[in-house]
Amino acid sequence: MLIGIAYLALFLAAGLLLARWAVPDGSPAVAVPLGCGFGVSLLAALPAGFALVCGFTLRAVWLAAAGAALLCAVLIFAGRGHIRFARDPDRGAMWLCLLPVLAVTLYLLHTHVLHKVNGTLHTGQSCYGDMPMHLGFIEYIAQSGQFPPRDPLLAGAHRCGYPFLCETVSSVFRLLGAGRRAAYLLPMVPAFVSVYGMFWQL
């Protein structure tokens, strides 16, 4: 779990630096949500890119981490003297709105998603059959190491036609030793920050 959190932090740092480079005059209200979006996108793309060469394995996961660290180093070197953010034009109004909504979201994720009850997983998330499908893809990618993955719903007889990059993010955390629930929830937190923050920018 701690390794997964550190891994996520590395990619979020890369995303934040990338956002700082993309919007050099942006305030934290712009850079943090954009950086979270970039970070989660990198977390989907980099391990998948290496997995095309060496399968979806720990080797691909650590090569992706090296790529993210290299990106951080390049962006820090390229942006020397320009790390400071601009002041928030709305003087923190976004954070006053976003943080309570994020707190409620985190509470609901903690209390309603994937709890063990008598050895089985229970959830209050209203997604019906969608969650078991996603969990199946996540587990299959992590366990099989095949990439691009086969479709586990069709006994692996066909390549997966579902847009599976969203599943690889959680599969990375499964390979790093996170439990099923932690792997499912970890990438949701920065994704929610990104979505809520970008809605504010609209």
Question: What name fits each language-model region?
Answer:
Residues V104-Q201:
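Active-site lumenal/periplasmic loops and adjacent helix-entry segments of GT-C-fold
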Residues A45-L52, A93, H122-Q125, G197-L202:
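Short alpha-helical segments and helix-capping/turn motifs at coil-helix boundaries
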Residues L70, R87-W95, G124, M131:
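A signal for specific C-terminal beta-sheet/loop modules enriched in small/flexible residues
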Residues M1-D90:
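Membrane-embedded, hydrophobic transmembrane alpha-helices
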Residues D88-L109:
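Internal/C-terminal transmembrane anchor helices
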